[in-house]
């Protein structure tokens, strides 16, 4: 297939695409329009939110859901503080100041968002969508009342960050991406980008400020990936150290010396693994493409692979070797690390493939390995959402869209004959695609149209080959992720016949 043919496919108005109802730019809804008073305020901002406070029994349920489903992956609120909030919420909620009330409603909203519709109805006696809209409105009103845009208080920033972490629906993607800029500015105004050791702050405040800064950074990268743009926070903009590998019980406000770090898995390990992956991601982004030498290898490409290998070794030594895969949160941590490293390995290869002068015929030994790795990135990304071990935290992974692996596999399926590896690729592609554009909403955003067109083309070619595919994902077992990505088992194609197709998608979306 020639590049011109593929570009015609992407540019043609007659090309197969989504209907207007499924467009990647959703129409404004009543829910999304609520955000205006949150940012600017208006005269009808509620003077009291008393009617939004739930009965004590419901407060207990929501706090329990927050501790199980949200706190393990967004550890920006100290557990003793949670207990104090619950005590006040269930005894005399009118005693809350405006700042604490904003955090309280953010906790309620995130707890509801983390629950399945069935659990919401059974435990709270109300529809999840209705509750989400109700408490989102309460959060936005509370943030306005707390003076969010002018705040100098950490607790208000915690409330805003928690709120944005839960605004993961496709219609909120641009809103979150925009609001992260505001949150980042507020964080800078509070000096979170500077390590608190410069200011002589105590160990407790230092640690909580580090946790909040790094989670804002994680949220910035996540929202930017969804919009196919660069993060707003750049390396060199901050010197805030990583949080300590400790449990909340090791930390208290009256400490005068920082607690010693633990060896092994702690409550902070998952967050620290995500932060180390983030640092790797930013390092790889800084390594720009350059020319290819006569052997078809790029010095910077080798540097990328070396950086990935060094990160993998460091993660294994410091964190992953302590993971007990029979424990759910340990399994999630190990799986996130392996999938992220595999994705970084893929993207590094894709960057090499996009460099001027790249010769795919000099790359035969990597062909099937690239395909198999892309398949496993999709398979294990799917498992992170659907496996019983991750039920409590699946809401977080719904924002994970490894579109590069998805596009690469579809590009390969446009040129590959029917074979077991192709069948497995189609199963992985179909599984994740159904979730991305399923009942929870279209997650692909700006990437939707080119990926949809590419999928339609690959499906048409598949139909011509007249081979049914069994929708079976037995090849992806939950316990297989820890050792890493397997070796290819099929005969190599010899070269990447799909390169023109894939690179056109990359140029359309941006890698």
Features from the language model and the residues they span:
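Carboxylate/His-rich catalytic cores and anion/metal-binding grooves
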Residues: 59-143
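Fungal transcription factor middle regulatory core
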Residues: 8, 15-30, 87, 118, ...
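Eukaryote-biased recognition of C-terminal alpha-helical segments
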Residues: 345, 409-412, 416, 432-489
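Intrinsically disordered, low-complexity transcriptional activation domains
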Residues: 16, 394, 473-511
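Short coil/turn linker motifs that delimit alpha-helical repeat modules in TPR/alpha-solenoid proteins
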Residues: 100, 152, 202, 209, ...
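Intrinsic, low-complexity transcriptional activation domains
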Residues: 1-71, 94, 98-103, 108, ...
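Long, amphipathic alpha-helical regulatory blocks in the mid-to-C-terminal portion
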Residues: 130-158, 162, 178-197, 215, ...
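Tandem amphipathic alpha-helical repeat scaffolds
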Residues: 108-114, 161-168, 222, 279, ...
């Amino acid at each position: 297939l020639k590049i011109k043919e593929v570009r015609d496919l992407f540019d043609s108005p007659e090309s197969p695409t989504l209907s207007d109802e499924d467009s990647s730019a959703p129409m404004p809804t009543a829910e999304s329009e609520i955000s205006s008073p949150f940012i600017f305020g208006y005269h009808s901002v509620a003077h009291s939110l008393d009617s939004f406070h739930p009965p004590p029994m419901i407060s207990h349920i929501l706090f329990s859901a927050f501790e199980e489903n949200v706190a393990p992956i967004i550890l920006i609120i100290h557990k003793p503080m949670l207990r104090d909030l619950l005590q006040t919420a269930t005894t005399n909620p009118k005693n809350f100041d405006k700042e604490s009330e904003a955090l309280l409603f953010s906790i309620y909203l995130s707890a509801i968002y983390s629950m399945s519709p069935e659990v919401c109805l059974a435990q709270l006696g109300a529809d999840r969508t209705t509750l989400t809209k109700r408490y989102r409105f309460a959060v936005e009103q509370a943030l306005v009342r707390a003076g969010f845009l002018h705040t100098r208080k950490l607790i208000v920033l915690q409330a805003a960050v928690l709120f944005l972490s839960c605004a993961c629906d496709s219609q909120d993607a641009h809103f979150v991406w925009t609001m992260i800029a505001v949150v980042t500015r507020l964080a800078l105004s509070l000096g979170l980008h500077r390590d608190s050791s410069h200011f002589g702050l105590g160990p407790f405040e230092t640690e909580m400020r580090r946790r909040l800064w790094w989670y804002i950074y994680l949220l910035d990268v996540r929202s930017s990936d969804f919009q196919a743009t660069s993060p707003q926070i750049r390396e060199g903009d901050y010197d805030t150290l990583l949080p300590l590998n400790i449990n909340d019980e090791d930390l208290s406000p009256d400490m005068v010396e920082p607690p010693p770090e633990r060896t092994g898995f702690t409550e902070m390990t998952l967050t620290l693994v995500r932060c180390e992956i983030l640092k790797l991601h930013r390092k790889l982004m800084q390594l720009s493409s350059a020319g290819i030498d006569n052997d078809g290898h790029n010095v910077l490409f080798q540097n990328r692979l070396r950086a990935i290998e060094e990160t993998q070794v460091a993660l294994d030594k410091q964190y992953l070797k302590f993971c007990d895969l029979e424990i759910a949160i340990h399994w999630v941590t190990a799986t996130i690390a392996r999938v992220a490293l595999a994705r970084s390995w893929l993207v590094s290869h894709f960057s090499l493939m996009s460099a001027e002068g790249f010769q795919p015929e000099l790359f035969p030994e990597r062909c099937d390995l690239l395909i198999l790795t892309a398949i496993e990135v999709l398979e294990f990304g799917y498992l992170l959402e659907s496996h019983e071990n991750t039920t409590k935290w699946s809401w977080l992974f719904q924002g994970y869209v490894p579109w590069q692996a998805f596009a690469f596999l579809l590009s390969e399926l446009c040129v590959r004959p029917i074979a077991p590896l192709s069948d497995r690729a189609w199963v992985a592609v179909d599984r994740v695609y159904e979730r991305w554009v399923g009942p929870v909403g279209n997650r692909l955003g700006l990437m939707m149209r080119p990926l949809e067109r590419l999928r339609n083309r690959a499906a048409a070619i598949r139909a011509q080959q007249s081979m049914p595919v069994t929708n079976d994902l037995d090849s992806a077992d939950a316990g297989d992720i820890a050792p890493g990505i397997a070796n290819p088992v099929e005969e190599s194609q010899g070269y990447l016949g799909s390169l023109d197709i894939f690179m056109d998608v990359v140029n359309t979306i941006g890698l």
